[in-house]
Each structure stands twice: as structure tokens, then as C-alpha cells.
Amino acid sequence: MAALQQKIRIRLKAFDHRLLDTSCDRIVDTAKRTGASPVGPIPLPTRRRIYCVLRSPHVDKDSREHFETRTHCRILDIYQPSPKTIDALIKLDLPAGVDIEVKL
């Protein structure tokens, strides 16, 4: 019977893809430095949210403006993490615009 591999799955979300990519690079570098084997970043589909707003507060229903937000997502898997890896990831300082979900 095969031994179960321990895995940490990190899911990152951000509106700015450059900020997201630099955060992924920092996590991968930290994992490699501490002896774990990272897989990724794996890009997930970008979610587009479009808002339609009337330009005028009173009349002119035909005049509308569209705004859009794009949410970029990435997944990182870290196999065989040591306690040193987990401590380094907890102490890692990442930008404020990145949402992080961690599953063990």
C-alpha cells in the first residue's frame, strides 16, 4: 500500500495579475529553500464581473457605462512540507491585495 503524501494546497486570488505572480514566486522560492517540492503555480480561469451603470442620475436611459473587475486565481501545491517549511510560509510577508486560502 502506498504511503500517503502530505500536501499543502494554497489558492491565491487578486485583481492585479502582476501582484499575484510575484506572490506565487515568493511562495515557491520559500518552499524550495526549506526542502519541500512545490508544484505550480497553476493558473485558473479569470473571472470577469461586469457592472452596468446609468451615466445620468435623472434621464437618458440609453446612456450607460460599463465597469469590469477581473479576478485572477492561481493554485500552488507543496508536497512533503517540513515544520520548517510551514514556519517559513507563516512568517512570509505578502502584499495586501492578495487573498490566500490554505488547505492542509
UniProtKB/Swiss-Prot annotation:
Keyword annotations of the record: Ribonucleoprotein, Ribosomal protein
InterPro entries (UniProt xref): Ribosomal_uS10, Ribosomal_uS10_CS, Ribosomal_uS10_dom, Ribosomal_uS10_dom_sf
Q: Which GO terms describe its biological process?
A: translation
* Recorded family membership: Belongs to the universal ribosomal protein uS10 family.
Record has Flavoprotein as a keyword: no
Q: Which Pfam families match?
A: Ribosomal_S10
- SUPFAM superfamilies for this protein: Ribosomal protein S10
Q: State the oligomer form and interacting partners.
A: Part of the 30S ribosomal subunit.
Q: Name one GO molecular function term.
A: structural constituent of ribosome
Q: Which organism is this entry from?
A: Thermosynechococcus vestitus (strain NIES-2133 / IAM M-273 / BP-1)
Of the GO CC terms on this record, one is:
ribonucleoprotein complex
What protein name is recorded for this chain?
A: Small ribosomal subunit protein uS10
What does the UniProt record say this protein does?
Involved in the binding of tRNA to the ribosomes.
